[in-house]
């Protein structure tokens, strides 16, 4: 009797399905454990909820103003979630779609590797390396960000471009560019690779030009239009190197060393090593593909925000696709040793995951990554918080601390505590402040003292540090 052996394609589908199941479960558990927050999970929930209720991409900003999501980031792909929200109105919907999308990115990696490396087994190894790549896994767990969907879309776009199928490439590239304003620059980099690496100069030039044009329009026209004529609020992160795209260009000519110092600090070099080591540096053998990673690297390395030079956040979304695609084409340069090279990359990804990845089980292994290892653990405190939040009507204007915000943002107005303004309900967690809450501990504490003494507010719930107030006058 003939023994059945699964094909490499079947195995990569199985690996992707297992990965999606695991990371969808981890994402939902982190949400139930209140490890997500108003920033950024709640922002996305409110934008999707508003769209589903006839107010496209409306949300409440930090100061209590009702604005368009496009005033902060050009990620209109959020609109696609509105019909899904009608069917399943839950933040879990966004988390599951994100895990599914990122996991399916393994398929274009497999197709690309099978074509160029010439070995289905090697292609399977490289696809699994993508799934084990620490930046990929942290991306899937960093709350919900539409830009995470750009990673699989960019991989799909690169596959179609490599095949010379420009129409489906265009569809995937446009979809990716709708995930965030700077993703268009990655698409432009793909155009440069296509023009020089595939000698399709006209088509590649058009792709590069369109990518640059849309990215520039999104940043300099769309965001200011929805931001009351003001430039992006995130320019402050680049104040040391010019404070704007134009200022950065001027700094490059007037004080070039300032850019070098900003982009290659010890923190930045550590970030680059965390991106490079789990791919065994094989991507260096395909330098033209790496052109697509340059804009995103510049955006992250020049920023003063430490989150942008950490693989734990979503800022790697535009980097993963060109780095992994370059690793595949780099491995193809060593086609004669395809299986051993793929094995080395897979081993590097596994070791990188052990040292840097988010899999909770690593904390039980000596030297394994322990950062956020218990983030998916739902505690008694979380159950108390969930019970407290059920007291708040779904149509009420709420002010809440960041750690509770992701569970309360599916409404027209949501205020970030300690801002109160027109709120009729307030929810706060005194014992477990979320990431954003730590920026203003004193105003938060003072506001809670004021609420306890104010006769206009009644404390209707207090247990284990969870407080819920209702306006009575």
Regions flagged by a language model, labelled:
Residues 149, 155-168, 195-198:
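Membrane-interface transmembrane helices that cradle and orient dolichyl/undecaprenyl
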